């Protein structure tokens, strides 16, 4: 396994560890999820470039689109929670149930 793949996998692992450890604020959870999606995008792009599989060239772009949608929904939820409750604690998400 090359050094680049190990660095990307380590970045994903560190983002996942950050997501599991810092669960109190929504902003830190969103940043950790963005780090995970970015490392997945880089890993998918490197894998497709190294395997010369031309039919799957759109897969990293589709992953990037899903990451952008996830970020937009997360930021909208963050703005709604911070305007309603004044804080961005994850525990306030339980209060949003209908």
From Swiss-Prot:
Family designation: Belongs to the complex I subunit 4L family.
Transmembrane segments: 1-21, 29-49, 61-81
Gene3D superfamilies reported for this sequence: 1.10.287.3510
Entries under InterPro entries matching the protein: NADH_UbQ_OxRdtase_chain4L/K (IPR001133), NUOK/Mnh_C1-like (IPR039428)
Reactions catalysed, as given in the entry: a ubiquinone + NADH + 5 H(+)(in) = a ubiquinol + NAD(+) + 4 H(+)(out)
Membrane topology, from the record: Multi-pass membrane protein
Protein name: NADH-ubiquinone oxidoreductase chain 4L
Function: Core subunit of the mitochondrial membrane respiratory chain NADH dehydrogenase (Complex I) which catalyzes electron transfer from NADH through the respiratory chain, using ubiquinone as an electron acceptor. Part of the enzyme membrane arm which is embedded in the lipid bilayer and involved in proton translocation.
GO biological process: ATP synthesis coupled electron transport
GO molecular function: NADH dehydrogenase (ubiquinone) activity
Gene: MT-ND4L
Subcellular location: Mitochondrion inner membrane
E.C. number(s) listed in UniProt: 7.1.1.2
This protein's record includes keyword Nucleus: no
Keywords: Electron transport, Membrane, Mitochondrion, Mitochondrion inner membrane, NAD, Respiratory chain, Translocase, Transmembrane, Transmembrane helix, Transport, Ubiquinone
UniProt subunit comment: Core subunit of respiratory chain NADH dehydrogenase (Complex I) which is composed of 45 different subunits.
